C-alpha cells in the first residue's frame, strides 16, 4: 500500500471548520464534487453509509468506516476501483491550534495501485486535496 498526506491551516476555529466538513454526504465543498446521496438508508454520518456522488465526469461510491465528532475526523474507503486505483482508505481530520484559535486540517490516504502508478496517484491525490481545501477556505471566508 502506498500513502498520501496533505495538511494546511485555516483561520477559523477547528469547530467552525468541522461544522462544514463533518457531514459525510455534504461533500460539495470539495473540488470536482457534484450531487451526492446516501444509497443504503443510513444516516449521513453513520458508519457503513455509502455515498454515491458525481466526481467530475463520473459516478463514485465511498463507504464511511469511521466518524468521530469528538476527534473531529472521519475515514472512508472506496467501494469500487477508480482507474488503476484499486482501493483506498482516506481520513480527514481537523485539530485545534490552541495558541491562535485556528485549525489544522490533514488529509491522509492509503491506497493500492500498481507500483509504477504510486507517484502519479500521490501527485493526483495531493493536488485534489489542495484544491478541495482551498475551495473550503474560500467558502469559510465568505461566511
Q: Predicted regions span which residues?
A:
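Solvent-exposed residues in well-ordered beta-strands and their adjoining turns
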Residues: 9-13, 54-56, 67, 79, ...
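Glycine-rich portal/gate segments that line the openings of hydrophobic small-molecule binding cavities
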Residues: 25, 37-83, 131, 139-143
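Hydrophobic/aromatic beta-strand elements that line small-molecule binding cavities or substrate pockets
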Residues: 6-8, 60-66, 88-96
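Hydrophobic residues positioned within well-ordered beta-strands of beta-sheet architectures
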Residues: 4-6, 49-51, 62, 90, ...
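Hydrophobic ligand-binding cavity/cleft-lining segments
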Residues: 1-43
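Beta-strand/loop substructures that line and gate deep hydrophobic ligand-binding cavities in soluble
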Residues: 79-131
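A short, structured loop/turn motif at beta-sheet edges
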Residues: 11-15, 66-71, 93-104, 138, ...
